[in-house]
């Protein structure tokens, strides 16, 4: 069965909202096991995101702690959204955080990271299809950013759910993931 991204967004938002805190914690532990199978030795700058607790997002802070413990040379950066210009850029982490218009934590805008400096990015998503196309919250920030990013960028999706059938409404602006991890599997697309 084929599905549109809007239909997938609706289904996956409901599934995500139904997750309990303990279910999320268990799946985060399983996601961490999958992340441990990835070779991080060629990553020097990792772009990530701060999880939204009210959206039951995967705990990327847990993943980064593991990665930085084993690979202390990796520097992390996080997005700052410019809602007026419908774009985002990444900045190296700061100890002090600020909330943006969407209630998402962001670093202070001091050390912007050029897109060609980022080796690997953890991409937030609600779900993905069998071709590596992601469905997010529908604002398009990541699609626009990934379109201008380094062509060798390793794009890793992090999902609580297995892939859906192929989305019927992908277009040239949809940048597929390199791979996506779920609690039970790692899917490679490139």
Task: Name each region found by the language model.
Residues 84-190:
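Conserved phosphate- and dinucleotide-binding cores of soluble alpha/beta proteins
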Residues 2-99, 104-109:
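N-terminal active-site beta-alpha-beta segment that forms phosphate/nucleotide-binding
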């Amino acid at each position: 069965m084929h599905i549109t991204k809007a239909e997938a967004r609706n289904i996956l938002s409901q599934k995500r909202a139904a997750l309990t805190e303990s279910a999320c914690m268990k799946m985060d532990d399983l996601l961490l096991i999958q992340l441990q199978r990835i070779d991080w030795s060629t990553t020097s700058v990792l772009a990530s995101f701060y999880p939204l607790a009210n959206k039951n997002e995967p705990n990327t802070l847990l993943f980064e702690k593991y990665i930085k413990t084993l690979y202390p040379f990796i520097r992390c950066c996080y997005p700052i959204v410019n809602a007026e210009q419908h774009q985002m850029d990444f900045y190296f982490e700061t100890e002090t955080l600020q909330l943006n218009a969407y209630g998402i934590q962001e670093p202070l805008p001091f050390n912007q990271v050029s897109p060609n400096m980022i080796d690997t990015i953890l991409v937030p998503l609600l779900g993905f299809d069998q071709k590596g196309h992601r469905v997010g919250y529908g604002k398009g920030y990541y699609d626009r950013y990934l379109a201008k990013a380094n062509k060798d960028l390793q794009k890793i999706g992090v999902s609580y759910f297995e892939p859906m059938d192929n989305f019927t409404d992908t277009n040239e602006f949809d940048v597929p993931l390199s791979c996506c991890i779920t609690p039970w599997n790692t899917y490679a697309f490139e």
